[in-house]
From Swiss-Prot:
PTM: Undergoes autophosphorylation in the catalytic domain.
Compositional bias segments (type: Basic and acidic residues): 701-714, 728-742, 753-855, 865-893
Higher taxonomy: Eukaryota, Amoebozoa, Evosea, Eumycetozoa, Dictyostelia
Protein name: Serine/threonine-protein kinase fray2
Naturally occurring in which organism (per UniProt): Dictyostelium discoideum (Social amoeba)
Stretches the record annotates as Disordered: 1-67, 368-467, 486-561, 580-914
């Protein structure tokens, strides 16, 4: 569309309209359509979207004109369910529109009620995914419906032209998602579409998807019902509940949506190759169709799941459209630009595509002999785009017949279908019966290159002869209605003409209607004997109806394509013109009951179809005697059986019939007396002289002939009476000899004529056989060329399909490889992350364990040291007590001296244990002093590295360390003093105590020196200026 911005702006509302006003508008438009021929329906309802805060006023819609002169029709783009669709230009807006033209007088497939429903549904729909309806009006007994023009056509048309195997999955997801939005809108507004298929899904030039064809949509809001039970839809897409004619609801559109998904995937709907009744049986009896048979790797699991959910025979198990929009399959849907790049970029324009599809389908239909491809009875209501077929108009009140002159062969009837030639068409002057036989494409005769010469002819009496008339154009009399008796007589006449090879003789008193009926029937249904097909002529004579010429306008109206009632036998006019042995019909002497002379009829013109005569043929006709029509009728069967050439003469009443004389009739007529012989010669001379005169001079020539005949007879009597009796015998002998010689001459002449006729017949048969063989050879060559072209086209299509399948397989392989590489990279990254996490967790665990161990060890050491201190303290207190007691006991009596020795040994043991605990505690203090000393040395080294001070030590830290060292020193000195006191008590402990004192003194001295150095460095650092 040229105005895409407006197209989206006028559909920006949320589809909430006043349903009562819209329905009333549609109903009023439909009532006007049924009652008046000047109906004009324009949808002017503007939908509004209101919110709780403030109303939003939409932009005004365009008012399209309601007159046909404001639109310029362009090419045909297809046919819908109820009419022809053409592209047009709206002249006021200069934009493309689609016009559906519906013939209200001859609409066979739809009724006015269906048209009303379709217009009502279109006028109430306003959605970006629904084809927009502008206006409608009546023009020349046709309803014009103006809609948006979607230049890409339907999905079915695109698949038939470029994608016969179906679309890829991304394209299907894009199309189905937009179509599902339109279905959601329909269901929200209380409507059922009931005919969702790819032929009703249209695409514009920008890749936007819209749903069309509301001819079978049902509205549930009008009546307040919750279900429908009408049998509407296309069989392949029809839900099972519609086939069973039970109550159904919105779920039927979900079934059709699933079938449409299969159609877009495979290129055709399930059971599309079967007739409608079998489709109904297969749908009801078989399980629902699915994508399982197409292979596991072709379609994704989400697509299969979508189709399976939609195609549930139980309507309650089918999901809602709003739920289907949330399906994971639609995550692969693309933007409209994707369709433009991958689908619409390589397509020709819609009109050109429609013409190409029409030509291909028409050629396929003509080249096949199957009855299911009959072009005269095709149903074009299925698709938006389909072949251009000539449908018969069964509703017309009158029919027309085709009069053609052909040269055909029964063996090549099927091949003549491909020869497109113009037909000489004339309107029939009578009404054909209601059951008119139709011809199939295989039996349509080809048309000849020559026309049949016609001439006027007048039925003459006894003394009149046939005058060669000039050639005039063939015209038929005016139309005369046919009665029942005339129709019965026509059927009997047709049956006899086909059975015997000649038309029966009827009574001259037949009515005018039967006469006209038989005349035209003789033109259209004349049957010629096989042996005389090249030499027969058809004569039509109007005795009571004057000849009228058709005006140019009427003759132009007669040139319209119609179907011929039956094929017409061949008449080769070239062979007729070249023949020298064809004689015109002879007139017989006037007798009672014979045909009336020209004086009784007057100068009434007639229509004669005959062939020109050669001079030799005219000379041979002069000496022959005239025959009676009764004799000709009696010898008709013998003439046709002997293979002689027939000459048919149809008079005004269809009763007069004359044929050329046979040799047997010549022999009988020549065996008469001498007087009859002279009469025949004189009559032949008179007939030869009268050929150059008109009808008024025939009477005078007949009077001259009679007077001469009387005078010759009188002179002959006188001579005969004056002859002597002596010469009578000799004269009789002479007469006998003359009679014999005349008989032999006539016999030889008749033999020669018959021989010449046989030779000419054989020559004609040979030439006809040669022509037939040539025609057969030509037909064979044409068939060969057609087969070759078909094979080439099939090979090309196969190659194209192979290339497409290869490209698809390559793309699939590439996508698979990419997905595999991506999955492998993901797996590698995951494994790396896992290994890193594991190593980090292991390191952290090991650190935690080591920390825990160190802490546990330190805690254990501290607890041990505390226990040892407590024990040593207890021991020291016990030792002091025991010492005091021992002193007290020493001053007592001597009886306690023995017991004190035993107790002193025990005390020594306790003191030894206390000394051991003090030794361990002293070692712990030394370790702690050494660690502090090492730390101080490291800090000193770091501060004084490379002769520069990196960072000065905090004096608070140094003071804390000093206090800690003091505490340790005091504790150590206390332990040493206690140890000295105890060594006096325990013997042999001097060496260990001295070692302890030396080690503890060295550790203390080291710690004091390191602390002193650290203090010196701090003081030096404080004295220097801080440059960093």
């Amino acid at each position: 569309m040229s105005d895409d911005k407006y197209h989206h702006d006028k559909h920006h509302d949320k589809h909430h309209i006043d349903s009562k006003q819209s329905t009333a508008a549609a109903l009023s438009s439909s009532s006007t359509l049924a009652s008046s021929s000047s109906m004009t329906t324009t949808t002017t309802t503007t939908s509004t979207t209101t919110t709780a805060a403030s109303p939003i006023t939409p932009k005004p819609r365009k008012n399209y004109p309601n007159s046909a002169d404001q639109y310029e029709l362009k090419e045909t783009i297809g046919k819908g369910g109820s009419g022809l669709v053409q592209r047009a230009i709206c002249l006021p807006f200069q934009e493309n529109v689609a016009i559906k033209i519906i013939d209200l007088e001859h609409c066979k497939n739809v009724s006015l009620e269906e048209i009303r429903k379709e217009i009502q549904a279109m006028s109430l729909c306003h959605h970006p995914n629904v084809v927009a309806y502008h206006t409608s009006f009546v023009y020349n007994e046709s309803l014009w419906v103006i809609m948006d023009f979607l230049s890409a056509g339907s999905c079915s048309d695109i698949m038939r032209f470029s994608f016969p195997q179906g679309f890829e999955e991304h394209v299907i997801a894009t199309i189905l998602k937009e179509a599902l939005k339109a279905i959601c809108y329909f269901h929200k507004t209380g409507r059922i579409h009931r005919d969702i298929k790819s032929g009703n899904i249209l695409i514009d030039s920008n890749g936007n998807i819209q749903l069309s064809d509301f001819g079978v949509s049902a509205t549930l809001i009008d009546t307040g019902e919750t279900s429908r039970n009408t049998f509407v839809g296309t069989p392949c897409w029809m839900a099972p509940e519609i086939m069973e004619q039970v109550n159904y609801d919105y779920a039927v559109d979900i079934w059709s949506f699933g079938i449409t998904a299969l159609e877009l995937a495979r290129g055709k709907a399930p059971f599309a190759e079967y007739p409608p009744m079998k489709v109904l049986l297969l749908t009801l009896q078989n399980p629902p169709p699915s994508l399982e048979g197409d292979g596991e790797s072709k379609w994704s699991h989400s697509f299969k799941d979508l189709v399976e959910k939609c195609l549930q025979k139980d309507p309650s198990k089918r999901p809602l459209p709003s739920k289907l929009l949330e399906h994971r399959f639609f995550k692969q849907a693309k933007k409209p630009d994707y369709l433009v790049q991958h689908i619409l970029a390589k397509l020709p324009p819609l009109g050109q595509r429609y013409q190409m599809l029409s030509e291909d389908s028409f050629a396929m239909l003509r080249n096949t002999s199957s009855p299911q491809f009959d072009t005269g009875h095709s149903n074009s209501a299925d698709e938006w785009i389909f072949p251009n077929e000539n449908n018969d108009n069964n509703n017309s009140s009158t029919t027309t017949t085709t009069t053609t002159t052909t040269t055909t062969n029964p063996s090549n009837n099927n091949n003549n279908n491909n020869n497109k030639t113009k037909e000489n068409l004339t309107q029939s002057p009578f009404e054909t019966p209601s059951h008119t036989p139709s011809t199939s494409p295989g039996s349509t005769p080809s048309h000849s290159r020559t026309s049949t010469p016609t001439s006027n002819h007048t039925a003459l009496g006894s003394s009149s002869t046939v005058v060669p008339p000039p050639v005039v154009p063939l015209t038929l009399p005016t139309a005369i209605p046919v009665t029942a008796a005339a129709y019965h007589q026509q059927q009997q006449h047709h049956h006899l003409s086909h059975s015997s090879g000649s038309i029966p003789n009827h009574n001259a008193s037949s009515n005018l209607g039967a006469s006209a009926h038989s005349n035209v029937h003789g033109l259209a249904h004349s049957s010629i004997h096989p042996t005389s097909s090249a030499a027969s002529t058809t004569v039509v004579n109007n005795t009571q109806q004057p000849q009228t010429l058709q005006p140019p306008q009427q003759q132009h109206q007669l040139q319209q394509p119609i179907k011929t009632p039956s094929p017409i036998n061949a008449i080769n006019i070239v062979k007729l013109n070249q023949s020298d042995l064809i004689t015109p019909p002879k007139t017989s002497p006037k007798k009672e009951g014979s045909i009336p002379s020209s004086s009784s009829h007057g100068n009434i013109p007639s229509l004669v179809t005959t062939s020109p005569k050669s001079p030799l043929q005219h000379q041979q006709q002069i000496p022959q005697q005239q025959q009676d029509p009764a004799m000709i009728n009696s010898n008709n069967s013998s003439i046709s059986s002997n293979g002689a050439y027939n000459r048919e003469l149809i008079s005004a009443s269809g009763s007069a019939l004359s044929k050329p004389p046979s040799p047997s009739s010549d022999k009988e007529n020549n065996s008469t007396s001498k007087s009859n012989k002279s009469k025949s010669r004189q009559s032949s001379r008179a007939s030869s002289l009268s050929e150059s005169s008109d009808s008024t001079s025939h009477t005078s020539s007949s009077d001259e002939h009679s007077s001469r005949y009387e005078s010759d007879r009188k002179s002959y009597k006188k001579k005969k009476s004056s002859s002597s009796s002596s010469n009578s015998k000799r004269d009789r002998e002479r007469e006998r000899d003359r009679d014999r010689s005349n008989k032999t001459y006539k016999n030889s002449r008749s033999r020669n004529v018959s021989r010449d006729r046989e030779r000419e017949r054989d020559r004609h048969n040979r030439s006809r056989d040669r022509d037939r063989e040539r025609e057969r050879e030509r037909d064979r060559d044409r068939e060969r060329d057609r087969d070759r072209s078909r094979d080439r086209s099939r090979d090309r299509s196969r190659d194209r399909e192979r290339d497409r399948s290869r490209d698809r397989s390559r793309d699939r392989d590439r996508s698979r490889d990419r997905s595999r590489d991506r999955s492998r990279e993901r797996d590698r990254d995951r494994s790396r992350d896992r290994s890193r996490d594991r190593s980090r967790s292991r390191d952290s665990d090991s650190r935690d364990r080591s920390r825990d161990r160190s802490r546990s060890h330190s805690n254990r050491r501290r607890s041990r040291s505390r226990d040892s201190r407590n024990k040593s303290r207890d021991r020291s207190s016990d030792s002091d007590r025991s010492r005091d007691r021992s002193r007290d006991r020493d001053y007592k009596s001597s009886k306690y001296k023995k017991s004190s020795r035993g107790t002193s040994g025990r005390k020594n043991n306790k003191i030894q244990s206390k000394l051991d605990s003090q030794a361990t505690h002293i070692s712990y203090l030394e370790d702690k002093i050494s660690t502090l000393t090492n730390w101080l040395q490291q800090q000193n080294l770091l501060n004084t590295s490379n002769g520069q001070v990196l960072s000065p030590t905090d004096p608070n830290l140094v003071s804390k360390l000093q206090t800690q060292l003091d505490v340790l020193q005091s504790e150590n000195s206390y332990l040493r003093n206690e140890n000295i006191n105890l060594k006096t008590i325990v013997n042999g402990s001097n060496s260990t105590n001295n070692s302890l004192n030396q080690s503890s003194g060295m550790a203390f001295r080291n710690s004091v020196s390191s602390l002193h150095q650290l203090n010196m460095s701090n003081s030096s650092n404080n004295s220097r200026p801080q440059t960093q």
